[in-house]
Amino acid sequence: DYINRRAGRVLEIGVGTGLSLDRYATHLQVTGIDVSADMLDKARRKVAERKLAHVVRISEMDARTLAFPDGHFDTVVAMHVISVVPEPEKVMEEMARVCKPGGEVLIVGHFARDKGFLAALERLFAPLANVIGWHSDFELGRILGVRSLEVIRTMPMPPFGIFTFLIQRKAEAARAAA
């Protein structure tokens, strides 16, 4: 719902089979990228079958080297992918680069807790979780180092606050250069 209150161009990193594409409001112009050609074929079929005219492009692309100009998107989204991509810090830099000044970078993911019983469980099971691609020990701080992005809000999400919704705003050009 938050994304649908935004306007303009949206880039979804790790769009996969397009699970979220029909949930975007029709006033948005959505581009989805992923590294899996097979998953993108399914996403393209979904766009065609459901006549999702607001989805303007589906492309095979590595999020570490986005083939878009600086400041091209009003909103850049990564749902449940930032902890599993190679070089997440580089991905964040690229997301910030293609986001317009004043635009937002939105992340949904699981981030390790730093204290409490659940934090201890995450650390205990991290080796097993990593084998299946779930990085329960991935720390939020790893992706907060992009100078041009300011954290606006973090919110726990269902179920049980396991996931976090992170909202970052890209600084206006003059502030980002400072």
Task: Describe each region flagged by the PLM.
Residues 106-164:
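C-terminal alpha-helical "lid/dimerization" subdomain adjacent to the S-adenosyl-L-methionine
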Residues 75-87:
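A short SAM/SAH-binding and catalytic strip from SAM-dependent methyltransferases
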Residues 89-101:
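A short glycine-rich, Lys/Arg-flanked "PGG" loop and its adjoining helix->strand segment in the class I
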Residues 11-13, 17-65:
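Class I SAM-dependent methyltransferase SAM/SAH-binding core
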Residues 1-9, 19:
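Conserved alpha-helix/loop element of class I SAM-dependent methyltransferases that forms part
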Residues 29, 102-104:
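Short glycine-centered segments of the SAM/dcSAM-binding site in methyltransferase folds
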Residues 165-178:
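C-terminal lobe and adjacent flexible extensions of AdoMet/dcAdoMet transferase-like proteins
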Residues 64-76:
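A short acidic, Gly/Pro-enriched loop at the edge of an enzyme's catalytic core
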